[in-house]
Structures are given as structure tokens and as C-alpha cells.
């Protein structure tokens, strides 16, 4: 079986592997806490090709992002379906897709906490959400709601221009009572997003997130926050810095979000600054790759065998082979950094897999 794309090996299955009988004896030990929990906004990305008349009928400004009321969103979906204009329907929430990617790549269980429509028609967008989600994701704890989940329409015109239309539906109606404590007892991490903190003042989602965070801290489960977009951070930097300090173990961000949070344009310096509030930082920098920053015990730091890299922190990757440890668990904590370049230089073009999701996580 050949592997598509650029690879170092010609075949997916190595032809020089050890005796399979010996491999069975030397099985990899199972993790005691393999489950990842995520609190997410259940939303479906719906991509369709439309003409300009379609946009005018629904009063959509071409090339812009707009919010749709529910009745108009329903009518729009009906017409797209009846005229067979939809090209893709995939889960679109950051957390849901991060869990999906984890379950696929790690072949391990994850639990999604969110909402789902009580009545689902075969072939509908909610149906597609469930169909295109990994079977290793546990959806049994989803809170049922009377109404639609979120829908994000990407309407592509004949000239390639993209128009976005969003209807949040009931995606922010997750209540704190729907966060079960028992799933945290054998969990490896709780993953949340900055998107969950915005919405209407009456939405219960922020309270649900806070309950999940409190349960995670109670059971000593690391809390992972992906910043999602710089627009949520800008203007509220101080609040987010305090939130990270009080609640978060690991933060994932890109260079724009890092600059909004820390004021540092350089992703390495932004990651270094974020260590004031958290124990581990992941900062993606587009085609440049991924920077990581964390803490380790001074006595246990391990030097790299790779070339030392220049940067605003000289030879920053010197101890990149060190194991990351929580700062509070180190007697003499020292900062360690690493950089991962895109594999074989990265792809020639970026293609969508299953929608939004933090691949770095």
C-alpha cells in the first residue's frame, strides 16, 4: 500500500519490521488515562455553489460574513438541498474537530460535551455531523435541544468569491447541569476554546465551560485552551491573561493570537511570554512551523542532538529533548523551547480535511 504525497518511505507498511509474533509479546502498555474531553459548539460547515441571484434573494452581501436569523437559515438550506447545490457538509467546530482528529490519529477515545438536535432527519445537516464524526468519539453525553445546531454556510459564487452566513441555532445552550463529573475521573485533558466565551449574555455556555474547568482542576486533569481567533483576544488581553493564570495548563495559538495576547510579534517571544501564565505553549507560525515552550527540572534537562537554531532567544532549542513538566512540580524550573518544521517542507497547497480544528493539539 503506497502512501500519497511526499514521504520518506515508499510503502505504508514497513517491509523490514520485526517478527509479528515477537511484536505481540512486546505490546505497548495501555495508557491509564487515554480519554480527552472537549466542550464544543456543535456547528456544521455547509459549502455550496450559488449564483449572484441566490445571494440577492437572501439579501447576502457578496464576499462578506453575515449572521442569519433562523427562519432565513432554514429557507436557505431548503433551497440548497432541493436544487442539489451543496458540495460538502462537515462538522465545523474547533473542539469537535480537534477531538475527531485526535481519535482518528491516536485511535483513542474522546468525549464531546455540547448540544444536539432532539429530532434529526436522515440526510439533514445534524445527521451529517454525526455521520462524519469518528466512531471513537463518545457523543452519548450531548445535551438534546429543541431546535437546530449551528450552521455556517460558505457560498461560493461563479467567480470564486466566498460569502459566509452563520446561524448559531442552539449551539451555545449547553447548560452546566449537562457536564457530568464521572467522565473526568479517567481523563487525560480537557480541551476548550476562546470561542465558547462569546455569545449572548443569556447563553449558559460560559457557565458550562467553567463547571468543566472546575471539575478538571478537581480531578487534576490538565486544561487546554485553543485561542481560536485574535478578535476574541484583542481588547481583552488582561482578562485572558488572568483567565490563563487561574485556569489553564496548556495554551495553543497562532502568531496573530499570540501577538494579541502578549504584544509580542515574534512567535517564539510570544510563547516565552505566555509561560508567565501557563505550563506549556504551542504556537503555530504558518509555513514556518510550530514553536513549543515549557518548563523542565534543571537537573533533568536534556541537550538536543540537532543543530542549534538562531532566534530572538539564542540557541533556544538547546534543551528541546527535555520532558515538559508543570512549573509547580519543578524544584528548580527552567524554560525549554523547541521548533518543529513542516514535514518535508509541507504540502504544495493546503487542503481542508474535515473543517476547523487545532491540528497542533
What are these regions (language model features)?
Residues 259-260, 350-361:
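Short, small-residue alpha-helix embedded
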Residues 75-80, 337-348, 358:
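The feature captures the short pre-catalytic strand/loop hairpin that immediately precedes
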Residues 1-65, 86-90, 94, 107-109, ...:
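Ribokinase/PfkB-type carbohydrate-kinase core domain
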Residues 91-98, 356-361:
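Catalytic-loop motifs flanking and including active-site residues across diverse enzymes
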Amino acid at each position: 500500500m503506497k502512501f500519497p504525497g511526499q514521504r520518506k518511505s515508499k510503502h505504508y507498511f514497513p517491509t523490514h519490521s520485526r517478527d509479528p509474533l515477537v511484536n505481540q509479546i512486546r505490546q505497548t502498555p495501555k495508557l491509564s488515562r487515554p480519554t480527552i474531553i472537549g466542550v464544543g459548539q456543535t456547528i456544521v460547515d455547509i459549502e455550496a455553489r450559488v449564483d449572484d441571484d441566490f445571494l440577492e434573494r437572501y439579501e447576502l452581501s457578496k464576499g462578506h460574513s453575515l449572521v442569519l436569523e433562523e427562519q432565513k437559515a432554514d429557507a436557505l438550506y431548503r433551497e440548497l438541498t432541493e436544487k442539489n447545490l451543496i458540495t460538502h457538509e462537515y462538522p465545523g467546530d474547533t473542539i469537535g474537530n480537534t477531538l475527531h482528529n485526535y481519535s482518528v490519529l491516536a485511535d483513542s477515545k474522546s468525549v464531546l460535551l455540547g448540544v444536539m438536535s432532539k429530532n434529526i432527519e436522515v440526510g439533514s445537516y445534524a445527521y451529517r455531523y454525526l455521520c462524519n464524526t469518528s466512531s471513537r468519539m463518545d457523543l452519548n453525553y450531548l445535551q438534546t435541544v429543541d431546535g437546530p445546531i449551528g450552521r455556517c454556510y460558505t457560498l461560493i459564487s461563479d467567480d470564486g468569491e466566498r460569502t459566509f452566513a452563520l446561524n448559531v441555532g442552539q449551539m451555545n445552550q449547553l447548560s452546566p447541569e449537562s457536564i457530568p463529573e464521572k467522565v473526568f475521573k479517567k481523563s487525560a485533558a480537557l480541551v476548550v476554546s476562546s470561542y465558547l466565551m462569546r455569545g449572548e449574555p443569556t447563553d449558559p455556555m460560559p457557565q458550562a465551560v467553567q463547571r468543566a474547568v472546575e471539575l478538571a482542576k478537581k480531578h487534576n486533569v490538565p486544561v487546554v485552551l485553543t485561542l481560536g481567533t485574535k478578535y476574541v483576544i484583542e481588547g481583552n488581553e488582561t482578562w485572558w491573561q488572568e483567565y490563563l493564570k487561574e485556569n489553564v495548563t496548556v495554551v495553543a495559538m497562532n502568531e496573530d493570537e499570540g501577538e494579541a495576547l502578549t504584544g509580542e510579534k515574534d512567535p517564539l517571544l510570544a510563547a516565552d511570554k505566555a509561560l508567565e501564565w501557563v505550563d506549556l505553549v504551542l504556537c503555530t507560525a504558518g509555513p514556518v512551523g510550530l514553536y513549543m515552550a515549557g518548563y523542565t527540572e534543571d537537573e533533568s534537562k536534556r541537550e538536543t542532538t540537532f543543530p542549534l537554531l538562531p532566534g530572538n532567544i539564542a540557541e533556544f532549542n538547546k534543551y528541546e529533548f527535555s520532558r515538559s513538566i508543570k512549573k509547580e512540580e519543578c524544584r528548580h524550573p527552567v524554560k525549554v523551547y523547541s521548533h518543529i518544521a513542516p514535514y518535508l517542507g509541507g504540502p504544495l497547497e493546503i487542503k481542508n480535511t474535515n473543517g476547523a480544528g487545532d491540528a497542533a493539539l
